[in-house]
UniProtKB/Swiss-Prot annotation:
This is Small ribosomal subunit protein uS13. NCBIfam families: PRK04053.1, uS13_arch. It comes from the Archaea. Signal peptide: none annotated. GO terms for molecular function: rRNA binding; structural constituent of ribosome. Gene3D superfamilies: 1.10.8.50, 30s ribosomal protein s13, domain 2. SUPFAM superfamilies: S13-like H2TH domain. Keywords: Ribonucleoprotein, Ribosomal protein, RNA-binding, rRNA-binding. Belongs to the universal ribosomal protein uS13 family. Disulfide bonds: none annotated.
Amino acid sequence: MADFRHIVRVAGVDLDGNKQLRWALTAIKGVGINFATMVCRVAGLDPFMKAGYLTDEQVKKIEEILQDPVAHGIPRWAVNRPKDYETGRDLHLITAKLDMAIREDIMRLRRIRAYRGIRHELGLPVRGQRTRSNFRRGQTVGVSRKKK
């Protein structure tokens, strides 16, 4: 076995070496537990091993799979951006690229004046929730007591 490292750097994120590999990978934004388990299986690694025992070659293999998971055999339904709006490819975005893509999607909806974009603009719920009692913003007004 390789030397144990308490912090392992994968895809620009520090992972806890004491956790199981599949749980450690969930620290990367855009990678959930199911996707992390798939990445481990495709890379030929035990998802239950401690992340601190990863070698540099194994880290590189994981990073390659995270860059293009569909090409490495992960199914299309598992990626977080199927049929990308601009390219039409099945992508799986992680970390800053994921944040940027979400921000660009919201800006596109606002620019074309779609209903969802207008709701985002106004700071209202976007997915059909009711607004009578929830989603109130700002400071609450307390109840004043009567003077005796």
